[in-house]
From Swiss-Prot:
Comment on bound cofactor: Binds 1 zinc ion per subunit.
Annotated active site: H698
List of residues binding L-homocysteine: I435, G436, S437, E488, D603
Keywords: Amino-acid biosynthesis, Metal-binding, Methionine biosynthesis, Methyltransferase, Repeat, Transferase, Zinc
An example molecular function term from Gene Ontology annotations: 5-methyltetrahydropteroyltriglutamate-homocysteine S-methyltransferase activity
Family: Belongs to the vitamin-B12 independent methionine synthase family.
An annotated GO BP: methylation
Descriptive protein name: 5-methyltetrahydropteroyltriglutamate--homocysteine methyltransferase
Species name: Bacillus pumilus (strain SAFR-032)
Pathway note: Amino-acid biosynthesis; L-methionine biosynthesis via de novo pathway; L-methionine from L-homocysteine (MetE route): step 1/1
Residues given in the record as 5-methyltetrahydropteroyltri-L-glutamate binding sites: R18, E19, W20, K21, K112, R519, C520, W565, E609
Length: 762
């Protein structure tokens, strides 16, 4: 009979009340000392461990906790310190500097962790890097837990293949050499764990799900070398986020357990297990509870499914796990949460998901009858949720059925629109603008809190927003920007704001998840049909436009980003959800245009992150993603200029889709890519309006005019000057006012310098 245990891959770091975030930001602002920071973070780490112990998880991970990012942890641990930071002597200062930058050094690039909403710091390989193990972070975490609770844990290590795959700075022909140089470091790290008495270590290799058969075979040789050095150490080789194509090769790796995702694999991992079997000498770590969404599990269905997995694999032992780290969901249901009970009962966060695993284990070991009450409770909660979410959305159904190609297409082609818009908008060469949001000061946040607590009336709050909007319109005019924004002071989050005004969304007060560093977000919950109910942005945008002769952009979040940054329902397709959102936004775009707004930005920063991991699955997603954007924007007049914005992406993969959006102008985060996208544009010109971010908004440093001028000059070598825009990387909500104004002044000056150069060479 198969032995059944429960295991976890990782737990949220931020704490139930975001204690982790608050400790970091307080330290960065100089409000607390290092001792307080370290003490608070230790407390959060141990609290997370205790939660997992309390939920009766048999194999608890340690080492997944971080002060900023687990990929950065790995880079620093192996001494991958970019040269521009090596003059810093203090390890903690260096660590934070790589992530956040300093006044003299640009931070390392940040990008999406596979196809999730989490961002990691991209490790930088440099030929001058001295490869060495500077400290053993997984061992430190293991010993800390053992001292505090006296329990064995499973240290988590980012795998060698994935670490190199996520890094930058090397040529393809250097990969093997870098891997070989890292093998002794990984061996040393694991040897120290073995010598400390560690029984199990989890090595995360999610990059194997997209690896070729040849790569999977080559990586096997790496693990043969490493594991031979640590014969007493049991290794779980963990994959997640999709299926493994080279399954037959993977299961021959010289490790004691293989971790597979049976939730986000489109059924392919189970098919492989049934077709090829599973090694009798290995443990199957089966990801059977969704680690990335927040819906309660149908325990009866899951019990049947797990039984099917076990029957197909017939392993000696199975570990029931989430499909991935629980980093991507909130910590637990907060006691002060104010959701409708019918909805709340249908949700499951990290802590509740662990309880589901424990219940499934009981059902497998004692029989379904032993958990009948839990199965019935879950079934009833999901039925109640379905009834709560019920709605026909007749308007959407009728519109959806009547769609034709003209609903996805602007009246005329881009070149003709460009001519019309140039005459209508009368903008200078290299127009300057921002991406949308301005700093939300303590005063802004305080005003919002007073309003939400009913300490302020709607009229009082509206008056405050108007005052702040006018102040920033004046600031923008003084700076000399060409196309202005209203600043988004009424918005907490670019998705939450729209979801609160659309039918079919629910919002929490405490369900925070980590986005990057200390940045946390509360993703909306799409539980029902999405519908437009009333104009959402017209009032604020029209007011801002009334204050200036310059054009003010309407600012909307696009349908794919709203979908990808939400916890979506799972009873209809993602395409159908995106189209529902697109119909709602289409009405908002039309309302803005009707109100006299000539420039409308529909942001799609999350378009690329929704890509399936396997390239063979891309075409369908990219097709409906572009369709949903065009459905949102194609009903406007030729004089109306449609902008979009994207960030944190490897755009080379989706340039055809960017073209397919048919936006008049796209602004792109660029400054942290260190010129990589320009190399691509040199070979593959983009001929519509384009703004490449000229400075990094994730860092408090103010870039010089010369620095931004260089980026503009480099861009103009490959971009048409008559359709190039100058802008920051992203919105400025999280920055402080003085640095924002200083940076924008330098940006406008850099644009003016570039215009003069162009005039001299005309």
């Amino acid at each position: 009979m198969t032995i059944v245990k429960t295991s976890n891959l990782g737990f949220p770091r931020i704490g139930l009340n975001r204690e982790w975030k608050k400790a970091l930001e307080s330290y960065w602002k100089g409000q607390t000392d290092r001792e307080t920071l370290l003490s608070t973070l230790d407390e959060q780490f141990l609290t997370a461990i205790k939660t997992q112990i309390d939920q009766q998880i048999d194999v608890v991970p340690s080492g997944d906790f971080t002060f900023y990012d687990h990929v950065l942890d790995t880079a620093v641990m192996f001494n991958w310190i970019p040269e521009r930071f090596r003059s810093l002597k203090d390890p903690l200062d260096t660590y934070f500097a790589i992530a956040r930058g300093t006044k003299d050094a640009v931070s390392s690039e940040m990008t999406k962790w596979f196809n999730t909403n989490y961002h990691y710091i991209v490790p930088e390989y440099e030929k001058s890097t001295e490869f060495k193990l500077t400290h053993n972070k997984p061992l430190e975490a293991y010993e800390k837990v053992k001292k505090a609770f006296g329990v064995e844990t499973k240290p988590v290590v980012l795998g060698l293949y994935t670490f190199v795959s996520l890094s930058k700075g090397y040529e393809p022909n250097e990969v093997k050499e870098i891997q070989q140089r890292l093998i002794p470091l990984y061996t040393q790290l694991l040897k120290e764990l073995e010598e400390a008495g560690v029984k199990w270590v989890q090595i995360d290799e999610p990059a194997l799900v997209t690896a070729s058969y040849e790569d999977v075979k080559a990586v096997k040789e790496i693990y043969q070398t490493i594991t031979e050095a640590v014969p007493a150490l049991n290794i779980l080789l963990q994959t997640y986020f999709d299926s493994v194509d080279a399954y037959e090769e993977l299961v021959t790796y010289p490790v004691e357990a293989i971790g597979l995702d049976f939730v986000h694999d489109q059924g392919r991992n189970l098919d492989q297990v049934k077709k090829h079997g599973f090694p009798k000498d290995k443990i199957l770590a089966a990801g059977v509870i969704d680690g990335r969404n927040i819906w309660r599990s149908d325990l009866g269905e899951r019990l049947t499914f797990v039984s099917e997995v076990i029957a197909g694999a017939q392993p000696k032992e199975v570990w029931l796990q989430p499909s991935s780290s629980l980093l991507h969901v909130p910590v637990a249901k907060h006691p002060s949460e104010q959701l409708e009970e019918k909805l709340l009962n249908g949700l499951s966060y990290a802590t509740e998901k662990l309880a589901e695993l424990t219940t499934l284990k009981e059902g497998l070991t004692k029989g379904a009858a032993a958990i009948e009450a839990a199965i019935n409770e879950a079934e009833q909660a999901l039925l109640t949720l379905k009834e709560f979410a019920k709605g026909t959305n007749a308007d959407f159904t009728a519109e959806r059925n009547n769609l034709s190609s003209k609903d996805f297409k602007r009246p005329v082609a881009f070149e003709e629109r460009l001519r019309i818009q140039n005459e209508s908008l009368e903008l200078p060469l290299l127009p300057t603008t921002t991406i949308g949001s301005f700093p939300q000061s303590a005063e802004v946040r305080s005003a919002r809190q007073k309003w939400r607590k009913n300490e302020w009336t709607n009229a009082e709050y509206d008056e405050f927003i108007k005052k702040e909007t006018k102040r920033w319109i004046d600031i923008q005019e003084e700076i000399g920007l060409d196309v202005l924004v209203h600043g988004e002071f009424e918005r907490t989050d670019m998705v939450e704001y729209f979801g609160e005004k659309l039918a079919g969304f629910a919002f929490t007060k405490f369900a925070w998840v980590q986005s990057y560093g200390s940045r946390c977000v509360k993703p909306p919950i799409i539980y029902g049909d999405v519908e437009f109910t009333a104009p959402m942005t017209v009032k604020e945008t029209v007011y801002a436009q009334s204050l200036t002769e310059k054009k003010v952009k309407g600012m909307l979040t696009g349908p794919v980003t709203i979908l990808n940054w939400s916890f979506p329902r799972t009873d209809i397709s993602r395409k159908d959800i995106a189209f529902q959102i697109a119909f709602a936004l289409r009405k908002e775009v039309e309302a803005l245009e009707e109100a006299g707004i000539q420039v409308i930005q529909v942001d799609e920063p999350a378009l690329r992150e929704g890509l399936p991991l396997k390239e063979s699955d891309w075409a369908d997603y990219l097709n409906w993603a572009a369709e949903s954007f065009r459905l949102s924007t194609s009903s406007v007049q030729n004089e109306t200029q449609i902008h979009t914005h994207m960030c944190y992406s490897n755009f080379e993969d989706i340039v055809d889709t960017i073209e397919d959006l048919d936006a008049d102008v796209i602004t792109i985060e660029h400054s942290r890519s260190h010129g990589g996208f320009l190399d691509y544009l040199e070979k593959h010109p983009y001929l519509k309006g384009l703004g490449l971010g000229v400075y990094d908004i994730h860092s408090p440093r103010v870039p010089s005019v010369e620095e931004m001028s260089q980026i503009i000059d480099d861009a103009l070598n490959v971009c048409p000057t008559d359709r190039f825009w100058v802008n920051p990387d992203c919105g400025l909500k999280t920055r402080q006012e003085p640095e924002t104004i200083a940076a924008l002044k330098n940006m406008v000056t850099a644009a003016e310098v570039a215009r003069k150069k162009l005039a001299q060479h005309a």
